């Protein structure tokens, strides 16, 4: 007897998702590219062109003809998946399947899998219900978080400090990794496009589900837009109301760090000029020409220092009043090399733990303590 097909609630927890061997999104590649459950694979039962053709038949001829043509294509595509991606799956393989509404596309694959003998599950309501669950999570989970913002001028290695803290066991939320962007004018990653807004939100939802209630979570100060990605309103509100630890560093240390951290741009200076053109409304033609001259001469230390002092630092100062009102302490860097970053991470972890337990702590930590 074929095993029954199980219907799964769209608000399935991350822990329950891990109980399945494979999460299969049977929607078209274009639908999958816009958003999907993180970790899912795309085994479409109709590709983009086929889906469009069946939709046209449905509207211009009649639903019966469309369903018959669609069923033939779905059967062919599922057969192709069984002969390729799924050919080595064992008897006890447990897939979780979803389509747009949890109807015909996922149902067709689940029925065939069940007839084979696989215990298949389908997300009730499909992606549409899953998306509502994500939006609900992004609305209410941030209100339960205990965030600690790590702020500081551009070039103070905040992202590296957070990742060093994570390696030491501190819980963090790395928005720049999720957004595939460093959150500044020169923050785009060459050859690595940003995710769609929806997929960013799906990833963030999973991260938030892993946050333990009452646990202090470190997160880098960001604007409400990271590249093309918008930080969800409730999460942004939680960030704006969270206490802050500020990182300071000498200008020369910041310049040296940025030259190392943005080596991909130093090696490809042609990538920088189109980005600088976005500053025409903020800086004079004379200043832009001076920056271009530094780039042409590959005078990276002077270029970086000038960009910091003329553009980034004034922008940071303009946002200072609200940030200072929430500031709970300062950690002072010296060199921003590997060892210094690790010491800063430990100092921030100590300060954050002290604040969380309401213990008195010094207002400043030196990175070499």
List PLM regions with ranges.
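Conserved nucleotide-sensing/catalytic segment adjacent to the nucleotide-binding pocket
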Residues: 167-238
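Glycine-rich phosphate-binding P-loop
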Residues: 104-105, 146-166
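Catalytic cysteine-centered active loop of the rhodanese-like fold, especially the PTP/DSP P-loop
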Residues: 72-124
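A short glycine-rich beta-strand->turn/loop micro-motif centered on a GG-aromatic cluster
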Residues: 118-132, 174-179
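Flexible, polar/low-complexity N-terminal or interdomain linker segments that lie immediately upstream
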Residues: 1-38, 66, 135-142, 147-151, ...
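Positively charged, proline/Ser/Thr-rich regional signature most characteristic
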Residues: 17-90
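Conserved NTP phosphate-binding and transfer environment spanning the P-loop NTPase/kinase superfamily
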Residues: 237-244, 248-369
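A conserved segment at the C-terminal end of the G1
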Residues: 110-113, 159-171
